[in-house]
């Protein structure tokens, strides 16, 4: 067997092959696609919200002015399970929308004071609205609001803070009014743990922000105002919005100048009504103590202190108990009440430089006293009335108790009426009622006897009237009248009796005429019937003596 061992040829293997072109190109394209994707991918933000109702990853869009600017990628619970974290991706080039004051909120159907909004989401679904910011740099996390902000961050105007001791007076969205015209809205309502009160943030739109000065006052506007005066009742009603939900009004009180503009976030006090604002202008006061023997039920702090209808001050504390004040409950127990006399109310009458304490002391010496009177019969509210009572015991000076000057008091109002009623009852008890009752009994007995006699008389008269003779009396009277009528007919003109009577009267008249000379003579000379009367001559005229 023949073997043929040839020499092997050794050749160098090529490292590159055209086969690798396809995967390399594919890898380059993939890398370019990835680079293009990430380089053109918009920023990612995290939205914090209490719940993700209606929000779905990959479906819920983010819009700004009705233009799609992003989409929600996922919604997951936070690690502490207290809130929801929503991962959202904005479109490329939308980085300019993100600033510190950028606002996100959920748009969905809502019914509020301004009407119904978000009806379009019934078909398209819930979406997130983005309001671009303008201040600060981009943030990674934002709060997602349940409703749109009442005022945009870039809106022109001013934000102020109202402090109140009562909760629930205002709600976000309530109107802010100036003399009935809406100039802003209530934005937020929070509880301040440091001040221990409720803080409301208000936004006043421009150009009305110039109306907010250091002298303005804010008060709760209920939408309806009832004023009962001696002229009648006056009712004022605001708009339907303020009537249903209320609001807040502000203005410069009467007597103050317009004031100076304030800085943003300036704090003001929220008053209950406009009347309490006028009372708050009197900051200077003098404390006095009053001890009332009457019941103070119905007397509240803030009640007026008046002198014949003119307000002089305010009730401060009811009742007022100092640490070292001790009293024993007995029939002479008196309740202390602290009042404040406000000198600024008396400047018009006393002058700017008058000493109110000295003047009040003089009035107390002249009989000025305090009493409780009813201010409202429906609610039973009381007020302190100051007036002169000359019959009260005189005082030589103002007494003090526990560092407070004392104003003497007298019983007034219902207590005074009760006292007068008791005095009247005492006088009635002191009357000699027994003799009066005996006399009245005797008079009543006499009256009864008189009534019996009168009844007997009436019975007798009834018997007489019922007798036959009394029944015949009208018939007899009619017969007599007929006879009289017939007799009178005989004296009618033309009858014989009438003619005879006329002739007799004529003869009598003739006889009287003939007797007149005789009667005249007898009148001149009574003895003319015995002696002949001489005729007097007529007087002759003579010449007057010269």
From Swiss-Prot:
One of its GO terms (biological process) is intermembrane lipid transfer. Residues 285-389 are annotated as: MCE/MlaD 3. It comes from the Bacteria. Its main location: membrane. One of its GO terms (molecular function) is identical protein binding. Residues 437-464 form a coiled coil. It is a single-pass membrane protein. Residues 1-15 are cytoplasmic. Belongs to the PqiB family. Forms a syringe-like architecture with a central channel. This is Intermembrane transport protein PqiB. It comes from Escherichia coli (strain K12). The lineage of its organism: Bacteria, Pseudomonadati, Pseudomonadota, Gammaproteobacteria, Enterobacterales. The gene is pqiB.
